[in-house]
Amino acid sequence: MRASITIDGLQDLQQEFERLENPRQRKASARRALRNAAKPLAALASSMAPRASGSLAASIGYGTRLSKRQAGIHRKMFRDDRVAVEMFVGASYAMGGGGRHAHLQEFGTGPRYHKSGKYVGQVSPQPFLRPAWDSYQATMLDTIKAELWADIQKSVARAERRAARLAAKNVAP
């Protein structure tokens, strides 16, 4: 699934962002803002997850890395997009056994039958991640904007202090 979000009125933020000369500083600022915005989304999804054994809720997290298989699929989907920073929220195999069946809980399964024709049941959908995203999306965008603004201000101030310190060091005999 591909989503496109347009945010209006961020020219001031863009101008401040361009004041960061080093691309690594820009990426680090964006990564920190996304991480701080992703934490509450992961917590909300975890609280909405079905609690049969509790392992599904424990497996929900956030991060910048995907599994090898997911990374290959992601590269194919977004081959032409050159995004500077990405953050992913969802169930992880590495964080608990519940991550392996998260998609089945979220979307459900159709009716299942043995080869003999005997009906063995189905899993009805119990969505937890999509409702969490739907309820937190607007707040998340505001959080990203506020976090980016604060982090950029700190980074610019730090760079200005560093430049002043170097200038004072070069002027002094």
Tell what function each PLM region has.
Residues 74-103:
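Mid-chain, well-packed structural core segment of small domains
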Residues 1-84, 107-173:
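Short, Lys/Arg-rich flexible segments
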